[in-house]
Amino acid sequence: MQENLRFASSGDDVKIWDASFLTLVDKFNPHTSPHGISSICWSSNNNFLVTASSSGDKIVVSSCKCKPVPLLELAEGQKQTCVDLNSTSMYLASGGLNNTVNIWDLKSKRLHRSLKDHKCEVTCVAYNWNDCYIASGSLSGEIILHSVTTNTSSTPFGHGSKQPIRHIKYSLFRKSLLGSVSDNGVVTLWDVNSQSSYHTFDSTHKAPASGICFSPVNELLFVTIGLDKRIILYDTSSKKLVKTLVADTPLTAVDFMPDGATLAIGSSRGKIYQYDLRMLKSPVKTISAHKTSVQCIAFQYSTSLTKASLSKGSSNKATAVNKRSVPVSSSSGAAQNSGIVREAPSPSIATVLPQPVTTALGKGSGAAQDEAGLARSKSTDIFSKETDAGKSQDFSSFDDTGKNSLGDMFSPIRDDAVVSKGGDESIGKGDGLDFLPQLNSVFPLRKNAGASSSLVLHSSPLNVLMGSSGKEENESHEPSAESKRAYLGKQEPKDAMKQFTKLISSGAEPGILNTCPSSNQARNLEKFEKPEKDIEAQLIHEPSVNGSSTTVPKAASSVTAGVASSLSEKIVDTLGNSRPGAPLTSVQIRFIQNMIQETLDDFREACHRDIVNLQVEMIKQFHIQLNEMHSLLERYSVNEGLVAEIERLREENKRLRAHF
């Protein structure tokens, strides 16, 4: 197995090149035809190369492990000029001058089947993604789908004899999408399920189109070339031309490198151009490859991706990355859309160029496709601006604001981990949040479960609002044994209230309430008022985002103190009036703790709502200021005098050009 990725080109002979450095590795010619070699394809393990000549003298399978050595010769004298291997490299499809499509069994070295549905010369053949169908195009302008499993052929479809088919190719992602180019320069995308045109690009090439190739990593991108020297990139989703380049010579062959970032294009003058999609103005490298025109270019399959996919057990077939994607399973008689393509696992296409593609796995026949039978795409064009899919539509008006500025400068609330409470509640009480109707669902406030010594951390909405990825911090304090017991024994306030009322009204049993000195009762009350003070202190001195302590205004502090003192008096009065001198039971203790916790939670929610409202209002004002600044800059950046002077100079230049 070769270490470096290679590609083969054919013209007057076959040459194997190092794809990275574009240096010649080997050259050979297993054919005796003076007309050159018209078609080549690699086996899935990159060890063998299949070639066919323009005269159709024979098909040769050569070993390319070390030096190229011809191993097998097929179809001698049968005029086969185009070839394609299936994904297992066990069967070979060929077509040629005798109007037939042949399927060869390479293991037995015999003709497996011969299909005689074409009326004219077959110019190209291609296996589909699961090897169930073979598509073939001919000079009569017809495309026919041959079912390998049922041994039947479809009704011919195409644009007629005025558009002879020169090249066809299946999309690697949209399994039912087939592309074709013809002699009149028309590029057509076909839906093979309905055998109808998905879209036709008329007059894109001013001369015969000679090649088409789909990107192995971008499900939207494909490329065509032609004898008009044009390289045209298309978007299958918007059905538009993305970019057009003009080369120096007529172009005859094209193929994508498996990484999807590099194009190798052959010309009629024997040159091979290497283009980088990230800088398409001119070729990165140019080499003189053949004495005649370059008739075919074929990259090897990515061996690293093949090994990775096989190690995961995703498929029993060898992975053909830049050819087709092998499904996990497929029924032999399934229709061509029986497996859906996994959506591209990588990011959107704007970031996809340097990354290799992973093997797309079929998921079975239940996958959803669009009305034309094509899997819907979530990615964007390779040249498009990357979209932020994680941004909520409600906040789309804030895209221009700074990413981290507001969240770090103005938020006194923690922007890190949240200590959640069992059965947490959302802040559904905020009436002042008309600007963000979904704010309560997007940023739910979570509360502590009852461990009074634990920090209560809140999630600030600002970093989410601005699309930032806030640094997560995990701060947790070990609750004391009393807090743990209180947490385990905690009940809902209503249940605790019922039990407490029942005990008070009916009187406690002798085994439950034991008389103790009044000092014990005072000690217990002091003991359970202490967590309340701790929480109050924690609320006042809650750490801010940057780690420094931010103090809540004194008004909030006084309100907190007033709430706590009134609550304490109410609890003491209630317990003292009910049974003077009796110690607190566990139910009473839980009830008190729940009352304190609920009161503090309500107060905390109110504070949080006020702060969020303030933050939202600040963001609105900043956005208004931003729009005002943009409008003022646009208004005053244009100097009328300079514009008039420029127009005067333009007129003078035109006059001078006309006279001199």
Curated annotation (Swiss-Prot):
One protein family per Pfam = WD40
Q: Which UniProt keywords apply?
A: Cell cycle, Cell division, Cytoplasm, Cytoskeleton, Mitosis, Phosphoprotein, Repeat, WD repeat
GO cellular component term of the entry, any: cytoplasm
Q: Highest taxon of the source?
A: Eukaryota
**Mapped WD repeat ranges:** 1-31, 32-71, 75-114, 117-156, 160-200, 204-244, 246-285, 289-332
Q: Which GO terms describe its biological process?
A: cell division; microtubule depolymerization; microtubule polymerization or depolymerization; regulation of establishment of protein localization
Q: What is its main location?
A: cytoplasm
Q: Where in the cell is it found?
A: Cytoplasm, Cytoskeleton, Microtubule organizing center, Centrosome
The answer to whether UniProt assigns keyword NADP to this entry is: no
For this protein, the record's Gene3D superfamilies field holds: YVTN repeat-like/Quinoprotein amine dehydrogenase
Q: Where is the PTM Phosphothreonine found along the chain?
A: T550
Sites of Phosphoserine modification: S325, S379, S397, S411, S426, S468, S637
Q: How is it modified after translation?
A: During mitosis, prior phosphorylation on Thr-550 by CDK1 promotes subsequent phosphorylation by PLK1 on Ser-397, Ser-426 and Ser-637. Phosphorylated NEDD1 can interact with gamma-tubulin for targeting the gamma-tubulin ring complex (gTuRC) to the centrosome, an important step for spindle formation.
The entry describes its oligomerization and partners as:
Interacts with FAM29A. Interacts with HSPA1A and HSPA1B. Interacts with gamma-tubulin in a HSPA1A/B-dependent manner.
Protein purpose: Required for mitosis progression. Promotes the nucleation of microtubules from the spindle. May play an important role during the embryonic development and differentiation of the central nervous system.
Protein name, per record: Protein NEDD1
According to its UniProt entry, this protein's organism is Mus musculus
Instruction: Point out the gene that encodes the protein.
Output: Nedd1
